[in-house]
């Protein structure tokens, strides 16, 4: 669970203590001893359950790390902000009330207030990057898919992939339940366009289902990782 959700109650009770805790956690992690080893960064995106539940994605983070990659899993809080931000499009084009738009924008500002100190400290750190604003994710995605694509992960999935590429995680696993129609549109459906805009993008869509072959999943992920390792060697040479 993200820091903004875990610490929300603490922040409301004692905001000074919460801000200090956020800064100290980031500084402690930033000062951990590190080696010079370079690993390919692999982002994990997709349907919300399959993305975050290890039992649903066959422990993909453990798999990536065991294969010598650095797994990058975007924040859960951003999905909540995506749900709130959708009210802007609904109010502007689909007949939702202006009141619902105002309330959801207030919720976004509240969550961003919770994350402000952590974001500021991440921006000053040596090894970490601050999370993107949901408004920026929407702007990144809207030239490929409309913000009216709100079924499931909708435009947010496209925005996450673009943000990962911007942060240097050009290798991406798009995890989805078998035959998940929304993901076929905003996940698989946009991969070709993303590759057109970013030729270095190395994206693979993996279907997860009790009847799906785990061997097939593993082979496709390893093929993606093989390409990632080759690209990393080219970059370092």
Name these PLM-found stretches.
Residues 237:
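Iron-sulfur (Fe-S) cluster-binding modules
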Residues 53-69, 134-234:
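Hydrophobic alpha/beta core scaffold segments
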Residues 43-47, 72-76, 174-175, 206:
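Generic beta-strand/beta-sheet core signal
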Residues 14-35, 154-158:
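Short N-terminal or domain-adjacent regulatory/targeting segments
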Residues 55-160, 167:
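Redox- and metal-dependent alpha/beta enzyme cores, enriched for Fe-S-associated oxidoreductases
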Residues 33-34, 45-53:
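Long, contiguous internal "core" modules enriched in hydrophobic/ aromatic residues
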Residues 30-41, 163-169:
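Glycine-rich phosphate/diphosphate-binding loops that line cofactor/substrate pockets in enzymes
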Residues 1-7, 12:
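Single conserved hydrophobic/aromatic residue that forms the stacking wall/gate
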